[in-house]
Each structure stands twice: as structure tokens, then as C-alpha cells.
Amino acid sequence: MAIKKFKPTTPSRRFMTVSAFDEITRREPEKSLLAPLKKTGGRNSYGRVTVRHRGGGHKRRYRIIDFKRDKDGVPARVASIEYDPNRSARIALLHYVDGEKRYILAPNKLQVGDTVKSGEDAEIKPGNALKLKNIPVGTIIHNIELKPGKGGQLARAAGTMAQILAKEGKYAHIKLPSGEVRLISLECKATIGQVGNIDHENISIGKAGRKRWLGKRPHVRGVAMNPVDHPHGGGEGRTSTGRHPVTPWGKRTLGKKTRKRKASDKYIIRSRRARKR
């Protein structure tokens, strides 16, 4: 994937970069795999803001993605590589030999005309999905299940990948994009390869309005607010917080640990916050 730069015709244009979309082969999505997507503006069913800094943005339609890869033993041809406004990765349209069509996350180097397959007899090549017990140690993977049959949940963003470090008993040791090493059942499925659109991390948004196109509203600092709006607010002129940093609701933040102990902690071999050597 190439990144496109612009001539500095305006101050915001100077630093803005976009994807060249060289890998995109089809402009219109497959209609049978679309669903309506209603915007919430960060509000819950009571109309109260539960997630701040959301609202607006360009209208989207949801692309139904096959994260489960449960159509085992049936080969499919990659018909097109498409843009998906709901995620950073590209998506690939598959045409199965029995006539069914599905979208999957497009792995790096997957091209139109390639054949992909899922199941125990699938080859170890990008785009194929197998259970972890059938994937060799050291293989790069993505779209990893946490529970067998639930569908991939880990390593789905553009350019992300995980690696199988070892297999022990009923579990595989998986190194995740964050650096965390975690035990995952060998019965869980994963897709071979790295997620495509690997240059996504190098894109510069360039201006505030482009964030608004994405449905993201301004993130205002507490010290820039009035006292009625935030515990850090108020004061004459520019002032410090005057206290330990807190959330808008008065809870300690910036250093205060809030993560509760979970039953799944026993599956974490190495924390993502462990010092990297």
C-alpha cells in the first residue's frame, strides 16, 4: 500500500496523507452482504452519553464479515479487495465454489484470483483458516478466536499480527500485537498471515475536520472547562489542576490501577505491560 501526499495548498493540507488505495479492485460493495448501521452519537437507550467524543461522521453501511471462517473444506476464489469504512483493514470478497459469497479480512499480499480455504486440510498460506492445533509453531496469524466457534476477536486491525510461540497440553502460547503472551485453546481457529493495509499507522490525519468525518468529536481537556463541567475546571487565567488528576466524575486517574482481577488472568503468561527486553 502506498501513501499519497499533497501539495501544501492550505495549512491543513501540508501534513495530510491518505492511502493511495492501490489495492482496491472494486468500488461498490456486495449488496447481499450489507446491513444498515444506525449512529448512536455515544448515547445509550436512555439518551445519555455513555461514550464521550462520538457523533456525526459520514453515513455508513455495515459490511457483514465472516470472522468465524466455519465453511470448512470448501475452496473460495478471491473476487475483489474492497474498502471498508467500519475498520482500518481492507476486506476481501470470496466466491465459494458452491455459489455463496462472504467477506473476510484481507491479509497482506492476498490478491484477486487467489484461492483460500478453511479446515484441517487447508494449506499454511495467507488467508487460510485452521485450528491452532493444525498450525505450526512460529507461524504468523491473525483473526484469532478466544472461544472455539465464537469467531475471531484478536489481531483484526490493519497491519496487526500474532505469533504461535509454543504448544503445551490443550493450549497454545500466542504472542499478541500488544506484546502480551496468552494461552489460547488449540481448538480455536486463526487465519494465516498478517492483516493487510500495513501502512495505515503511517497516515497523518492532517486536520480536525477529517476526524469529524470519522465520527469523532473534540477531546476537551478538563483544565479548559468551567468548574461545573470538570473537577479540573475554573481558575483565573491558565491554571494547573490543583489536585491529583481525576476523571470528570471525580475518580483518580493517571497511574491509579482500575483493572479488576478476572478468571481469565490465569491464561496470561506475560503481561502486555511487562518490561520489553
Swiss-Prot record:
GO terms for cellular component: large ribosomal subunit. One of its GO terms (molecular function) is structural constituent of ribosome. Residues 223-277 are annotated as: Disordered. Keywords: Ribonucleoprotein, Ribosomal protein, RNA-binding, rRNA-binding. The keyword Ribonucleoprotein applies. Gene3D superfamilies: 2.30.30.30, Nucleic acid-binding proteins, Ribosomal protein L2, domain 3. Residues 253-277 have a biased composition (Basic residues). SUPFAM superfamilies: Nucleic acid-binding proteins (SSF50249), Translation proteins SH3-like domain (SSF50104). PROSITE patterns: RIBOSOMAL_L2 (PS00467). One of its GO terms (biological process) is cytoplasmic translation. The keyword Nucleus does not apply. Pfam families: Ribosomal_L2 (PF00181), Ribosomal_L2_C (PF03947). Belongs to the universal ribosomal protein uL2 family. Part of the 50S ribosomal subunit. Forms a bridge to the 30S subunit in the 70S ribosome. PANTHER family: LARGE RIBOSOMAL SUBUNIT PROTEIN UL2M, RIBOSOMAL PROTEIN L2. One of the primary rRNA binding proteins. Required for association of the 30S and 50S subunits to form the 70S ribosome, for tRNA binding and peptide bond formation. It has been suggested to have peptidyltransferase activity; this is somewhat controversial. Makes several contacts with the 16S rRNA in the 70S ribosome. This is Large ribosomal subunit protein uL2.
